[in-house]
Amino acid sequence: MGETTVLLHTCCAPCSSAIIEALLHSGITPVIYYCNPNIYPFEEYEIRKRECTRYAQSLGLEIVDADYDHDSWLDQMTGLENEPERGGRCLKCFKMRLLRTAQYARERGIKVITTTLASSRWKSLDQINEAGRWACYNLDGTSDLDAGENIPGTSTILPQNEVIWWEQNWRKGGLQERRLQIIKEYDFYNPLYCGCEFRLR
């Protein structure tokens, strides 16, 4: 990859734990970006943020809170309330969160982003990677979240990209096993759903 810093979009401490450890062991320092307007209720959002912060601080890492913007998220999900898991609502949710991640990376001068969502057994890696590529190619935010991928290849890195999407399957390489160990070591709160209120129905 060539970079020593990456902006890591983080959904919760358990999903991020082994990924952060692996990055550090590889000489890469993650800046942890907590951007999760999908999480409901607010108390759940706060618990997950607190656990992410606890883990980041234990490792001396920076964590950035993108603030809770659930109303905007609900507005974007209008009409998708009854979509199944891994359907159109998930893709749009990923796009919204990863676009904000990419835009923040550009503000900070961080060249590479990735997400802990790619460690979740509940989510589609294809959707996550589509959303990540789309976010990095549409940094100006003028493209509608409903638009298609709108980039010329599944793994193309274009010269106009100010931020690059790091496509990585964070479920492999022993990370799932290590994640379970870290959860026990830190006694993390371990969420049993992605955070979306519509998934609870």
Functional labels for PLM-detected ranges:
Residues 1-201:
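Nucleotide-activated chemistry modules centered on ATP-dependent adenylation/adenylyltransferase
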